[in-house]
């Protein structure tokens, strides 16, 4: 975790506690190359250090809707994908990342890649490539998907023109983020999702999947990212803002004060307790 992760966690925790809800800690470890049990345990330790307690979930999957570790939930994702297959909107895609991100590939005005439909039926004819496993994509509609974000306000996204058909399962068998979080949020009864505003357009993709799977979407709240001194979003490479560094230089109360001031909850970055923020 880094400062940005902790900021999102705090804002989500405060929202849930103020509304009398239940805070779920889900371990999203879909990428085996970047996920280890010790990393998840460290996240739990960092949250406890700050005083952020959860009502369900965690590595040990306490609660009625477990397991709360995504790598243990493949059966749920497989069932959801089967439901989407039945709509006739999914198809195999043999495109590689390198092919899709070539300079000639279509991009949105902000530089975001738009899938051009290379393998979309009926273009798939003759497209299957021997010895190359396909990913699974879903056809998106050429219409506006609208929703009101609790922080960013009214939103309208045309998936076909701004994102394109997106992946549900990667060629290596890993489940895509969009399918996994929609399935999990629906089955776990999640009613509010709070996260960084870099994922704002993901909400439209997820709402589309909610529609197809017959679930009610949650409310979305996308908070501004914390940026470094160069105006770039934080990453694990920012070691000075890692939890290890922050715990060495701050008390829980002083770090809470810093984050609460960043959120506009208090006038200055002075130490504060969670009770005083509620």
Predicted feature locations:
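Alpha-helix initiation and N-capping motif
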Residues: 40, 74, 78, 97-100, ...
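Alpha-helix boundary recognition
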Residues: 82-86, 186, 247, 260
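Polar, glycine-rich mid-to-C-terminal structural blocks
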Residues: 89, 135-137, 266-267
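Active-site cores that bind ATP or allylic diphosphates and position pyrophosphate for catalysis
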Residues: 98-235, 242-246
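Non-catalytic terminal extensions that flank enzyme cores
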Residues: 18-23, 50, 57, 127-129, ...
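Structural motif
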Residues: 1-3, 172, 249-254
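N-terminal Rossmann-like or analogous alpha/beta NTP/dinucleotide-binding catalytic cores
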Residues: 1-108, 197-198, 202-215
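A short, terminal or domain-edge coil/loop segment
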Residues: 48, 79-89, 119, 143-156, ...
């Amino acid at each position: 975790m880094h400062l940005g992760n902790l900021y999102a966690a705090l804002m989500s925790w405060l929202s849930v506690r103020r509304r009398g809800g239940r805070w779920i800690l889900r371990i999203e470890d879909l990428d085996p190359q970047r996920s280890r049990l010790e990393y998840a345990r460290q996240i739990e330790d960092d949250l406890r250090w700050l005083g952020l307690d959860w009502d369900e979930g965690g590595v040990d999957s306490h609660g009625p809707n477990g397991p709360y570790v995504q790598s243990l939930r493949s059966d749920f994702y497989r069932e959801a994908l089967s439901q989407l297959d039945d709509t006739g909107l999914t198809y195999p895609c043999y495109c590689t990342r390198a092919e899709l991100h070539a300079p000639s590939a279509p991009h949105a005005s902000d530089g975001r890649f738009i899938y051009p439909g290379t393998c979309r039926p009926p273009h798939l004819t003759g497209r299957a490539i021997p010895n190359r496993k396909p990913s699974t994509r879903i056809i998106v509609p050429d219409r506006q998907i609208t929703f009101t974000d609790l922080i960013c306000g009214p939103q309208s996204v045309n998936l076909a023109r701004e994102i394109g058909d997106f992946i549900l399962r990667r060629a290596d068998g890993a489940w895509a983020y969009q399918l996994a979080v929609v399935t999990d949020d629906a089955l776990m009864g999640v009613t509010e999702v709070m996260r960084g505003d870099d994922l704002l357009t993901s909400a439209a993709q997820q709402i589309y999947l909610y529609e197809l799977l017959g679930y009610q979407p949650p409310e979305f709240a996308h908070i501004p990212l914390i940026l470094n001194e160069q105006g770039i979003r934080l990453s694990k490479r920012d070691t000075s803002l890692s939890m290890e560094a922050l715990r060495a230089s701050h008390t829980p109360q002083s770090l809470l004060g810093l984050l609460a001031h960043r959120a506009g909850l208090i006038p200055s970055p002075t130490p504060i307790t969670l009770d005083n923020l509620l």
